[in-house]
C-alpha cells in the first residue's frame, strides 16, 4: 500500500500518456483515495492507473 513520502514511478495514467515513466514523491492521499505528488498536476487513481513504489 502506498503512503505519503513514498517514491513512485508511474507506469500508466488513464488519459494522460505523457505521465508514463515519471517518478515523484507522494505528498497527499485525499479523502477518496486519489494519490497526489510531485510528478505534476494530475492525481493517480488506484485500481485505474498503474504505478510502482521505487525502493531506494
What spans do the regions from the language model cover?
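Basic/aromatic-rich interaction segments and small domains that mediate binding to polyanionic partners
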Residues: 3-56
Amino acid at each position: 500500500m502506498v503512503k505519503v513520502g513514498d517514491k513512485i514511478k508511474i507506469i500508466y495514467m488513464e488519459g494522460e500518456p505523457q505521465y508514463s515513466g515519471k517518478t515523484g514523491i507522494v505528498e497527499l492521499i485525499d479523502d477518496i483515495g486519489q494519490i497526489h505528488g510531485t510528478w505534476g498536476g494530475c492525481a493517480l487513481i488506484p485500481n485505474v492507473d498503474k504505478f510502482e513504489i521505487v525502493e531506494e
